[in-house]
């Protein structure tokens, strides 16, 4: 199939990156080397794939959902020994055979699957990862990136920001306008780099699980004070004890609590419930 004859499919959320400067920027921040095993999610017509394969990498494995693009990609890259292609849905595909080989993940994420993609590749609190990615480079919706990077006191602060910041080091590289894509989306995107925190450097799994539980309960009613949300799992006596031992005011709303305070709350909650 000629690439010019392929039209994007709305159901796949296809907005292909065509801005050459951003394509080059992704390659630059990936800091590729001869030991890198790259996983590219949704290569589309292969614009970024070409850039990445032009580097001294060990392997690039691409996963593409759109069956109509498979022959196009194979025709384009089948003479490159570093390239392999798999047709499938990244949300359900089994990566067990290559997961421990992958060093870097690169993707222009369809907006409609951002949440599940973050769960799979950045991870979830209380669950040990079975991979060791050095770097994850995502081009994703700007307002989601802004929420992820939010600090306490910001109206954008939420469970997502606490979870992502506990699981990885995050750096926003730049914002990307709709005109950088074909067809242009309705919103701005951001280029962001995640460096997952190694399992042995993460918090104790029991603490992570407690943080996740506290976040879920608190942010389900984000306009309420902590005192009025956590009373579903704690008595008034326990709330007062937890507030005092953690040095956290329970008259605050969840978006005003810092990550360090969430950690203290989880640690002391475990002690109180023993």
Swiss-Prot record:
S-adenosyl-L-methionine binds at residues 15, 17, 42, 64, 89, 108. SUPFAM superfamilies: S-adenosyl-L-methionine-dependent methyltransferases. It is found in: Cytoplasm. It catalyses: adenosine(1518)/adenosine(1519) in 16S rRNA + 4 S-adenosyl-L-methionine = N(6)-dimethyladenosine(1518)/N(6)-dimethyladenosine(1519) in 16S rRNA + 4 S-adenosyl-L-homocysteine + 4 H(+). One of its GO terms (molecular function) is RNA binding. Pfam families: RrnaAD (PF00398). Keywords: Cytoplasm, Methyltransferase, RNA-binding, rRNA processing, S-adenosyl-L-methionine, Transferase. It comes from the Bacteria. One of its GO terms (cellular component) is cytosol. The keyword Nucleus does not apply. InterPro entries: KsgA/Erm (IPR001737), rRNA_Ade_diMease-like_C (IPR023165), rRNA_Ade_Mease_Trfase_CS (IPR020596), rRNA_Ade_methylase_Trfase_N (IPR020598), rRNA_adenine_dimethylase (IPR011530), SAM-dependent_MTases_sf (IPR029063). Its EC number is 2.1.1.182. Its main location: cytoplasm. HAMAP family: 16SrRNA_methyltr_A (MF_00607). Belongs to the class I-like SAM-binding methyltransferase superfamily. rRNA adenine N(6)-methyltransferase family. RsmA subfamily. Specifically dimethylates two adjacent adenosines (A1518 and A1519) in the loop of a conserved hairpin near the 3'-end of 16S rRNA in the 30S particle. May play a critical role in biogenesis of 30S subunits. This is Ribosomal RNA small subunit methyltransferase A. It comes from Prochlorococcus marinus (strain AS9601).
């Amino acid at each position: 199939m000629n690439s010019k004859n392929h039209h994007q499919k709305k159901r796949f959320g296809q907005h292909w990156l065509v801005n050459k400067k951003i394509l080059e920027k992704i390659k630059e921040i990936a800091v590729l080397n001869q030991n890198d095993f790259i996983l590219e999610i949704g290569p589309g017509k292969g614009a970024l794939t070409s850039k990445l394969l032009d580097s001294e990498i060990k392997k690039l494995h691409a996963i593409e959902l759109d069956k109509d693009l498979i022959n196009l990609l194979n025709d384009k890259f089948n003479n490159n020994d570093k390239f392999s292609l798999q047709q499938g849905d990244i949300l359900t595909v089994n990566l067990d055979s290559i997961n421990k080989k992958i060093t870097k993940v690169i993707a222009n994420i369809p907006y409609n699957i951002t949440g599940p993609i973050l769960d799979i590749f950045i991870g979830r609190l209380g669950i040990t990862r079975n991979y060791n990615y050095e770097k994850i480079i995502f081009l994703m919706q700007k307002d989601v990136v802004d929420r992820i990077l939010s600090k306490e006191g910001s109206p954008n602060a939420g469970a997502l920001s606490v979870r992502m910041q506990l699981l990885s080091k995050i750096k926003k590289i730049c914002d990307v306008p709709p005109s950088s894509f074909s067809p242009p989306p309705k919103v701005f995107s951001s280029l962001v780099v995640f460096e997952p925190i190694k399992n042995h450097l993460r918090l104790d799994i029991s603490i992570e699980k407690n943080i996740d539980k506290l976040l879920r309960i608190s942010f389900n009613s984000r306009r309420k004070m902590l005192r009025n949300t956590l009373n579903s799992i704690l008595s008034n006596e326990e709330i007062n004890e937890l507030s005092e031992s953690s040095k956290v005011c329970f008259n605050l709303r969840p978006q005003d609590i810092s990550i360090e305070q969430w950690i203290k709350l989880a640690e002391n909650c475990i002690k109180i419930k023993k």
